[in-house]
C-alpha cells in the first residue's frame, strides 16, 4: 500500500521549466529515446489479439498491454513491478507506458526529411546552394551529384545524368566520387565547413552590388549562423534512423464484428518497414543497381508520406480513397493537436439548456433547473451526504441521489448556496460572453437569464442555448465571485460605457412613464412629497402623464466626494416623480426629469456608477428593470395597421419626382447627358424624394393635435405606438418606419449597384409583383451577408487575438516622455469626438499650459478622469499630448501609465491585465455588426460627396491650416494646395468645425476674420479640377495644334467654343510626343518664372482638359487657365465595413495607392518613357534630386515648379500605411489608422476606445529593418524585433561601438503573429509546418512569455491572478537555486553534451 501512495505522489510532481527549445534530433538522440527496434510490419495476431513480437505494437519494446501483467501471463500483480519476464521479454509495468515509450527503425539507406527539403525556403537547398529541383533529382535517383571531384575537371556539387556519369567514368576512372540519393546529399551536407563558409559570406556581402544577390547571400548566412549557434548539424536533416511513435498514440481498436479501426499512421509505418526490409534483403543479395535504386526511391517516398503526406506528388490514399493522415496533418489545422486538444479542451462539470427570461431575478442570479443542478453538483452532494451521516459510503450516496430522496434536495440547496456558476453563450466574442451568477433552483428544464445581461451575451430568447460550468476549487470560486460576477461587469471593456443597459420592453415602459401629455387628469396640481404623488396616482386621481408640481428633497454628490442636500419644488410629471423613488441618493432629480429614451437611460446608469459607486448602481439597475416592465405592461402599447399613418404629401412628392425623371430621360434620348450622368441624376432625385416622404411621414407621426385645458387646439408629441417605440429606442428605427408608412425606396442589384426604379409603395399599401420581386433580392443578400460576415468577423478576431495575446501590463511606469498628440476629431461642421472624450482615461505625457500663458494647468502624469475632462473643456484646450501604448517603452508587455484607465473598472489598469486580448476582443466583437458591402461612389452615396461650398454652422473666427493660396484682384483667396483646411474657432479659441479645401477653392474670408453662422465662406466647382495661375501675364500656347493635340468643341446650347486636349491614344502619330502647355510671358515677351524658383511658368495640360483662355489673352493672379473634368478620375469603390477593417489591420497596400512626395523640394518633369511620366523632385537643401516614374493615366495634383513637402500627396488615391510610416513617422501612421478604423465603426454606431486600436498597432510595429549594421551582429536588411535591437544597441553603446541603425516596419496582423518570438504561439496560429521547420533549424527557444504558449504547455497564463503565481514561482525557485538539481536535469544536460560532441 505504501508503495502505491509513493507512486501516486511521484506522479504529481510538475517539471519546473522556463523555456522550451526545439531542435533537430541526431541519430544518437533518436536511438537514446528508443526502447527497441521495430523490425516487422505486423501489428497484432488476428487470432489471439496479442501484439506480434518486434512488430509495430510489440509488448517487449513498448510495454505490457495490461497493467502489471506480462504478455504470457507468468508475472501478474503489483509485487513483480519492474521484473522482465524471461519467456516473453516484457517488463511488468503500468500499461500507460505504451503512451510514452518510443521505438526506432534503422533505415537501410538514408532518407531526406521532407520538411527541410520542401518547406519553403528549402533549408537543404539553401545550405548546399542548389535549387530544389536539382536536389530532388538527386534524392529521387534521376541524377548523380559529384561529391569529391578529386583531380578531375568536374566540380563539387555538379549534377550528372546517366550518360554524363558513364562518360566521366570512362574518362577519369575512379579519380572522382559521384553518387545519387539521400546518402549523396548527406555527404555534401556533412562536408560543409560552417565556420569557413560564414566567414566567406560575411566578406562577400559588402562587396556585392545586386540587391537580389545580397538577399540570397544573407539568407544563406543567416541559416548557417543559425546552424552554428544552435548546435544542430546539417547532416541531421537527412535521417538514418526513424523514430516510431508510441503505440497508444496510434491505436488499433477492435470494433464489433471482428473488424479493426486503426490510425492512419500504422499504415504509413507499415509501408516504411516493408520497403526498408525489402531494401535490406536486396542489398544482402547485391541486386542489380537499378532495382536497388528504385527501392531506395520508394523508401524515400514512404518516409515522405509518413512525415507529411501530400507535400510531394500525390497523397497516398487508404482503402477508401481518402488521403492518409500523416504526422504533419496530426498537428496542423483546426482539427490538429494545437487547436483541437491544446488550446480547445472539452470541459467536465458542464451542462447546456435553452434560456428563458427571468424578470424576477436579481442581477447576480440565474435560474438553474433542479435536475441540472443535481447532476452538476453531484460530487459536492455526495460529500455533504456522507459528512452529515445520511449515507455511509459514496456508493450509498449515489443511490440516494439516483432515487432523488427528499434529503437530497435539502442538501442540494445547501451546496448551491453562495457557490457561483459560470454561464457561457457561444459564440464567446468578448470576455463578457462568460459571466458568473449565483444559481437559484427552479422547476422546469430551461435556464433563466436576467434580462439586463442579454446585451453582454448578445442573447435573445428565441431558442438560444447556454452552457453552465461549475468552478470546482476554492480559488476558482473566488475568482468567479470577485472578477466574473455579472454585478462586477457593469461597464463594457470596449468603451467604458455601461453594458448593463435596459432594452426593448423596459425602455418602452420607462419612456412611457416619463412622457408628458397636455390636459391629462390632475394637470396643474401641487404635491407635498413623492409619497403623496404615489397615493394620488394609485387612487386614479392623477394620470401618469399629467404635468404637476411637487416638492422634493434631494441629496446630490459632487465629484470630490462631498454632498449637498436641498428641498425644492419642481415642474414635472407624475411618472417622473414615481421614477425618482428608485433613483439612489446622491443623484439630482434632473436626471429623471426628461423623457427616458435609451440614450438617456444609458447616461443615467453611467452617471450613477461614477457618482454613487458599483453597489448602488447594481441595485438601481434592477429597480429600473422592474419599474420598466411594470409600466410597459400598464401602457398596453401595441401596433395596429392604423398606426402606420401615410402622409398626404406622398402622392405629390412622388408625382413631381416622376416628372423630373421623365425630363432627364428625354434629355438622355436627345444626347444631352451621358448614361452615367443620367443614372446619377435619377438616383439623386429618388433619394431626395425618399427623404422628403420620410420627413413628411415623421412630421405627421410625431405630432398630434389635442385640446388643452383652455379649450384651444394645440400640438403635442404623438402617443402613436409605433412612433413611441422608435423614439424611445426600444425597437425599430426611422428607416424601418419609412418602409412601413413612407416608401420602400431604392433597392440594390446583386453587384451592389442601385436599381434606377425605386419601390414607391410601402408595406401598408402592399407591393406589386414587380416591386416584390425587386425587393426579394435585397432580403436574400442580407441573409447571405450575415452568414459570410459571421465567419469573416470570427477569423478577424482570431487573428487579432493571436497578434496581441502576449501583451500584458507588466510594470507601472516605463518613464517615457513620448506620446500621441490628441486633437478633437472634427469632420466637416461637426465635432465627432470632442477632445475631452478622446483623452478620458489617458495619462498626460507633457504638461498642459493654459492657452496663451506659461501656467501649467494639467501636470504630466495625470490620469484624466471625468473631473479633469470638464476642466480641460472649460479651459478651451485644443490639443494634449497623451501617453499611448504605441510609444510605451516597456520591453516585454506594456506599462500601466501608457495604457491609462482600465475601461471596465474605471481606475488605472492593474498589473497583469491582459490588455492585448481585451483590445482584440473589443475590436472583433462588434465585427458582426459591420457590413460586408463595398460602396460604389454613385447613386445615393455620392450626393453627400459632391459638396461645392463651405457653409459654417457656428459663428466664430476663421483659421486656415497649411493652406497655400494666391489673392485674386477682387480680394478673394484661391487655394493652390490640396491639404489646406479651414476651421472655425469659438470665442474660447476651441475649434468647432473643420473643412477640407480642395485645390482651386475660392475663399471669401481671411485668417482671423469673424463670420456668422450660416455664412458661405468658400466655393468651388465639384465637377472639375481647375488649374490656377499664380501670377499675371500673357498667355502663350505651346504645342497646341488643332487636330493633332487639341480639338475645338462648340457647345450646342450656349454656342461657346472650348478647346479640349486630346488623349494620347486619340492623337495622330505626329502628336504622340508633343506636350501641350500654356506658357506665361511678361509684357516684354520674355518667359515669366514661377515665384521663388528659376522654373519657367508653364502649365502642362493633361488629357481631356478644357482650356478656358485664348492665346495671347491677359490674365490675372488666381484666374483659371483650364479645367479637368472630374468624370475622368475613375470612380473608386469605397471598401466599407469588415473588409476595410481587415485591410487596415493586415496593412495591405491598396491598389493604385496615392503617391506621396519622398522628399521636400521643387517639382519638375523629366524625360517621359512609354506610358510613364518622370517626376523629379529637387530637394531645397541641394542634395541629389529624387526621381520617380508615374503611369500616365494617374492624375497628378502638382504642376511643374510647385513646392512640396515630404509626405505630401502628389497623386490622389487611397493612402498606403507603409508610405505614411516611412515618410511621416509613427504618430502620423497611428493617427491615420485609428481614424480610418474608427470611421468604419462610427458609421455603424459602434463605440470603441482608441487605445484598443493603438494596442494592436503596437504589435504591428514590433519589427524593425536594419538600415546599417554598425558593430552589431545584424545583417543589413534583416527584420528584427525592436526590443532585441534596442537591447543590442544599449550593449554596443556601453562598449563605445557603433550602434545599428534601423527603420520601423509595419506588419499586417497575420504576418506579425507568424513572426512572433514564440514559435509555439506562431505554430498554433497558421502555417504550422513552416513555423516548426524554421524553429527547429535555428534551435529556437520559447521563453513562454505570452498567454498562448502557457496554455499549450498546460500552465497558468502569466496574466491576472496567474501573473502573481508565476512571479512567486520564479522567486521561490531563485531562492532554492543552489540546493538541488533534479535527475532529469542532469540527464538532459548529459544528452545535450553528448549530442553536441557526438558525430
UniProtKB/Swiss-Prot annotation:
Superkingdom as given in the UniProt entry: Bacteria
Cystine pairs: none
GO biological process: DNA-templated transcription
UniProt-annotated binding residues for Zn(2+) 1: 70, 72, 85, 88
Catalytic activity: RNA(n) + a ribonucleoside 5'-triphosphate = RNA(n+1) + diphosphate
Cofactor binding annotation: Binds 1 Mg(2+) ion per subunit.
GO function terms (MF aspect): DNA binding; DNA-directed RNA polymerase activity; magnesium ion binding; zinc ion binding
Record InterPro entries: DNA-dir_RpoC_beta_prime (IPR045867), DNA-dir_RpoC_beta_prime_bact (IPR012754), RNA_pol_asu (IPR000722), RNA_pol_N (IPR006592), RNA_pol_Rpb1_1 (IPR007080), RNA_pol_Rpb1_3 (IPR007066), RNA_pol_Rpb1_3_sf (IPR042102), RNA_pol_Rpb1_4 (IPR007083)
GO CC annotation terms, alphabetical: DNA-directed RNA polymerase complex
Binding-site residues, Mg(2+): 460, 462, 464
Keyword field contains Magnesium: yes
Keyword annotations: DNA-directed RNA polymerase, Magnesium, Metal-binding, Nucleotidyltransferase, Transcription, Transferase, Zinc
HAMAP family in the record: RNApol_bact_RpoC
Binding partners and assembly: The RNAP catalytic core consists of 2 alpha, 1 beta, 1 beta' and 1 omega subunit. When a sigma factor is associated with the core the holoenzyme is formed, which can initiate transcription.
Function: DNA-dependent RNA polymerase catalyzes the transcription of DNA into RNA using the four ribonucleoside triphosphates as substrates.
Family: Belongs to the RNA polymerase beta' chain family.
Protein name: DNA-directed RNA polymerase subunit beta'
Organism: Pseudomonas fluorescens (strain ATCC BAA-477 / NRRL B-23932 / Pf-5)
Originating gene: rpoC
Amino acid at each position: 500500500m505504501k508503495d502505491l501512495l509513493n507512486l501516486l505522489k511521484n506522479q504529481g510532481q510538475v517539471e519546473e521549466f522556463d523555456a522550451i527549445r526545439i531542435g533537430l534530433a541526431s541519430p544518437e538522440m533518436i536511438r537514446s529515446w528508443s526502447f527497441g527496434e521495430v523490425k516487422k510490419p505486423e501489428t497484432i495476431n488476428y487470432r489471439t489479439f496479442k501484439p506480434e513480437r518486434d512488430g509495430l505494437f510489440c509488448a517487449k519494446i513498448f510495454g505490457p498491454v495490461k497493467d502489471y501483467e506480462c504478455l504470457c501471463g507468468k508475472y501478474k500483480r503489483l509485487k513483480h513491478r519492474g521484473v522482465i519476464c524471461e519467456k516473453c521479454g516484457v517488463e511488468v509495468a503500468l500499461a500507460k507506458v505504451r503512451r510514452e515509450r518510443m521505438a526506432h527503425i534503422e533505415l537501410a539507406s538514408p532518407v531526406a526529411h521532407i520538411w527541410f527539403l520542401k518547406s519553403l525556403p528549402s533549408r537543404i537547398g539553401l545550405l548546399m546552394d542548389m535549387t530544389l529541383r536539382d536536389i530532388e533529382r538527386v534524392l529521387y535517383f534521376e541524377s548523380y551529384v559529384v561529391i569529391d571531384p578529386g583531380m578531375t575537371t568536374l566540380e563539387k556539387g555538379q549534377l550528372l545524368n546517366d550518360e554524363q556519369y558513364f562518360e566521366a567514368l570512362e574518362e577519369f576512372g575512379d579519380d572522382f566520387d559521384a553518387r545519387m540519393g539521400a546518402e549523396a546529399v548527406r555527404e555534401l551536407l556533412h562536408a560543409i565547413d560552417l565556420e569557413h563558409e560564414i566567414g566567406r559570406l560575411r566578406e562577400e556581402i559588402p562587396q556585392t552590388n545586386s540587391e537580389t544577390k545580397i538577399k540570397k547571400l544573407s539568407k544563406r548566412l543567416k541559416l548557417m549562423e543559425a546552424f552554428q549557434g544552435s548546435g544542430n548539424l546539417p547532416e541531421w536533416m537527412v535521417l538514418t534512423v526513424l523514430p516510431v511513435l508510441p503505440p497508444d498514440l496510434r491505436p488499433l481498436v477492435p470494433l464489433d464484428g471482428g473488424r479493426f479501426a486503426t490510425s492512419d499512421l500504422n499504415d504509413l509505418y507499415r509501408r516504411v518497414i516493408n520497403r526498408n526490409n525489402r531494401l535490406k534483403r536486396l542489398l544482402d543479395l547485391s541486386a542489380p543497381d537499378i532495382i536497388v535504386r528504385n527501392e531506395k526511391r520508394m523508401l524515400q517516398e514512404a518516409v515522405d508520406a509518413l512525415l507529411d503526406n501530400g507535400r510531394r506528388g500525390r497523397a497516398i490514399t487508404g482503402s477508401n480513397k481518402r488521403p492518409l493522415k500523416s504526422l504533419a496533418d496530426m498537428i496542423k489545422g483546426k482539427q490538429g493537436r494545437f487547436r483541437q486538444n491544446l488550446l480547445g479542451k472539452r470541459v467536465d462539470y458542464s451542462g447546456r439548456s435553452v434560456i428563458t427570461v427571468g424578470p424576477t431575478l436579481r442581477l447576480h442570479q440565474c435560474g438553474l433547473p433542479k435536475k441540472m443542478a443535481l447532476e452538476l453538483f453531484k460530487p459536492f452532494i455526495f460529500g455533504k451526504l456522507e459528512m452529515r451521516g445520511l449515507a455511509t459510503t459514496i456508493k450509498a450516496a449515489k443511490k440516494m441521489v439516483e432515487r432523488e430522496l427528499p434529503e437530497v434536495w435539502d442538501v442540494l440547496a445547501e451546496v448551491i448556496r453562495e457557490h457561483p456558476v459560470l454561464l457561457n453563450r457561444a459564440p464567446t466574442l468578448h470576455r463578457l460572453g462568460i459571466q458568473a451568477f449565483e444559481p437559484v433552483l427552479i422547476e422546469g428544464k430551461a435556464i433563466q437569464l436576467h434580462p439586463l445581461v442579454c446585451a453582454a451575451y448578445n442573447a435573445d430568447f428565441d431558442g438560444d442555448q447556454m452552457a453552465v460550468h461549475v468552478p470546482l476549487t476554492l480559488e476558482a470560486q473566488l475568482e468567479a465571485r470577485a472578477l466574473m460576477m455579472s454585478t462586477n461587469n457593469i461597464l463594457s471593456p470596449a468603451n467604458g460605457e455601461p453594458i448593463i443597459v435596459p432594452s426593448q420592453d423596459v425602455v418602452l415602459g420607462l419612456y412611457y412613464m416619463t412622457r408628458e401629455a397636455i390636459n391629462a387628469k390632475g394637470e396643474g396640481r401641487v404635491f407635498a412629497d413623492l409619497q403623496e404623488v404615489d397615493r394620488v396616482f394609485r387612487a386614479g386621481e392623477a394620470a401618469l402623464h399629467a404635468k404637476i408640481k411637487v416638492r422634493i428633497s434631494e441629496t446630490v454628490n459632487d465629484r470630490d466626494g462631498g454632498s449637498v442636500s436641498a428641498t425644492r419644488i419642481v415642474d414635472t410629471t407624475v411618472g417622473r416623480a414615481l421614477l425618482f423613488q428608485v433613483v439612489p441618493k446622491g443623484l439630482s432629480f434632473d436626471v429623471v426629469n426628461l423623457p427616458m429614451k435609451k440614450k438617456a437611460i444609458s447616461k443615467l446608469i453611467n452617471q450613477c456608477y461614477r457618482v454613487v459607486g458599483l453597489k448602488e448602481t447594481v441595485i438601481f439597475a434592477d429597480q429600473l428593470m422592474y419599474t420598466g416592465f411594470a409600466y410597459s405592461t400598464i401602457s398596453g402599447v401595441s401596433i395596429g395597421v392604423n398606426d402606420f399613418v401615410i402622409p398626404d404629401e406622398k402622392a405629390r412628392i412622388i408625382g413631381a419626382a416622376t416628372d423630373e425623371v421623365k425630363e432627364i430621360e428625354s434629355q438622355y434620348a436627345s444626347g444631352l447627358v451621358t448614361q452615367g450622368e443620367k443614372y446619377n441624376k435619377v438616383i439623386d432625385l429618388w433619394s431626395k424624394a425618399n427623404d422628403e416622404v420620410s420627413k413628411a411621414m415623421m412630421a405627421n407621426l410625431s405630432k398630434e393635435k389635442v385640446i388643452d385645458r383652455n379649450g384651444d387646439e394645440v400640438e403635442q408629441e404623438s402617443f402613436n405606438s409605433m412612433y413611441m417605440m422608435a423614439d424611445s429606442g426600444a425597437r425599430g428605427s426611422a428607416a424601418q418606419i419609412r418602409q412601413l408608412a413612407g416608401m420602400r425606396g431604392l433597392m440594390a442589384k446583386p453587384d451592389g449597384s442601385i436599381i434606377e426604379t425605386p419601390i414607391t409603395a410601402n408595406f401598408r399599401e402592399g407591393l406589386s409583383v414587380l416591386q416584390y420581386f425587386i425587393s426579394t433580392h435585397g432580403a436574400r443578400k442580407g441573409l447571405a451577408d450575415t452568414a459570410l460576415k459571421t465567419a469573416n468577423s470570427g477569423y478577424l478576431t482570431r487573428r487579432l487575438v493571436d497578434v496581441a495575446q502576449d501583451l500584458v501590463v507588466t510594470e507601472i511606469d516605463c518613464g517615457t516622455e513620448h506620446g500621441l498628440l490628441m486633437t478633437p476629431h472634427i469632420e466637416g461642421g461637426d465635432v465627432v469626438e470632442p477632445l475631452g472624450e478622446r483623452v478620458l482615461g489617458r495619462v498626460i505625457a507633457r504638461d498642459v499650459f493654459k492657452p496663451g500663458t506659461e501656467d501649467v494647468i494639467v501636470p504630466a502624469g495625470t490620469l484624466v478622469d471625468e473631473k479633469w475632462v470638464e476642466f480641460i473643456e472649460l479651459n478651451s484646450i485644443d490639443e494634449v499630448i497623451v501617453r499611448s501604448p504605441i510609444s510605451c517603452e516597456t520591453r516585454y508587455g506594456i506599462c500601466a501609465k501608457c495604457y491609462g484607465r482600465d475601461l471596465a473598472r474605471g481606475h488605472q489598469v492593474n498589473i497583469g491585465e491582459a490588455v492585448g486580448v481585451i483590445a482584440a476582443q473589443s475590436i472583433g466583437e462588434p465585427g458582426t455588426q459591420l457590413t460586408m458591402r463595398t460602396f460604389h461612389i454613385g447613386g445615393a452615396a455620392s450626393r453627400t460627396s459632391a459638396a461645392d461650398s463651405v457653409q459654417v454652422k457656428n459663428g466664430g473666427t476663421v483659421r486656415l491650416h497649411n493652406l497655400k493660396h494666391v489673392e485674386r484682384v477682387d480680394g478673394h483667396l484661391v487655394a493652390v494646395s490640396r491639404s489646406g483646411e479651414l476651421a472655425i474657432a469659438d470665442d474660447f479659441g476651441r475649434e468647432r468645425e473643420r473643412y477640407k479645401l480642395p485645390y482651386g477653392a475660392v475663399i471669401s474670408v481671411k485668417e482671423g476674420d469673424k463670420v456668422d453662422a450660416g455664412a458661405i465662406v468658400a466655393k468651388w466647382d465639384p465637377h472639375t479640377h481647375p488649374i490656377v495661375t499664380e501670377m499675371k501675364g500673357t498667355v502663350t500656347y505651346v504645342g497646341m495644334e488643332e487636330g493633332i493635340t487639341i480639338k475645338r468643341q462648340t457647345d450646342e446650347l450656349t454656342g461657346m467654343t472650348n478647346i479640349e486636349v486630346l488623349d494620347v491614344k486619340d492623337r495622330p502619330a505626329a502628336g504622340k510626343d508633343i506636350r501641350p502647355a500654356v506658357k506665361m510671358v511678361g509684357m516684354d515677351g520674355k518667359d515669366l518664372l514661377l515665384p521663388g524658383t528659376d522654373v519657367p511658368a508653364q502649365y502642362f495640360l493633361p488629357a481631356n482638359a478644357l482650356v478656358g483662355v485664348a492665346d495671347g489673352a491677359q490674365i490675372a493672379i488666381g484666374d483659371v487657365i483650364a479645367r479637368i473634368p472630374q468624370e475622368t478620375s475613375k470612380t473608386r469603390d469605397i471598401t466599407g465595413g469588415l473588409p476595410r477593417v481587415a485591410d487596415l489591420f493586415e496593412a495591405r497596400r491598396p491598389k493604385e495607392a496615392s503617391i506621396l512626395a519622398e522628399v521636400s523640394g521643387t517639382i519638375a518633369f523629366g524625360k517621359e518613357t512609354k506610358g510613364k511620366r518622370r517626376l523629379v523632385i529637387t530637394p531645397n537643401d541641394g542634395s541629389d534630386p529624387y526621381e520617380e516614374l508615374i503611369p500616365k493615366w494617374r492624375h497628378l495634383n502638382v504642376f511643374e515648379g510647385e513646392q512640396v513637402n515630404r509626405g505630401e500627396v502628389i497623386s490622389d488615391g487611397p493612402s498606403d500605411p507603409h508610405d505614411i510610416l516611412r515618410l511621416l513617422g509613427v504618430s502620423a501612421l497611428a493617427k491615420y489608422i485609428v481614424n480610418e478604423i474608427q470611421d468604419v465603426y462610427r458609421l455603424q454606431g459602434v463605440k470603441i476606445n482608441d487605445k484598443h486600436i493603438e494596442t494592436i498597432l503596437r504589435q504591428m510595429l514590433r519589427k524593425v529593418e536594419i538600415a546599417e549594421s554598425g558593430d552589431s551582429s545584424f545583417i543589413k536588411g534583416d527584420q528584427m524585433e525592436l526590443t532585441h535591437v534596442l537591447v543590442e544597441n544599449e550593449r554596443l553603446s556601453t562598449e563605445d561601438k557603433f550602434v545599428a541603425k534601423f527603420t520601423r516596419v509595419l506588419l499586417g496582423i497575420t504576418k506579425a503573429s507568424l513572426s512572433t518570438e514564440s514559435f509555439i504561439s506562431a505554430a498554433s496560429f497558421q502555417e504550422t509546418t513552416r513555423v516548426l521547420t524554421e524553429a527547429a533549424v535555428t534551435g529556437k527557444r520559447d521563453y513562454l512569455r505570452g498567454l498562448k504558449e502557457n496554455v499549450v504547455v498546460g500552465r497558468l497564463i502569466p496574466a491576472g491572478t496567474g501573473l502573481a503565481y508565476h512571479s512567486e514561482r520564479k522567486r521561490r525557485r531563485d531562492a532554492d537555486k543552489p540546493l538541488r538539481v533534479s535527475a532529469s536535469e542532469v540527464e538532459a544536460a548529459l544528452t545535450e553534451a553528448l549530442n553536441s560532441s557526438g558525430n
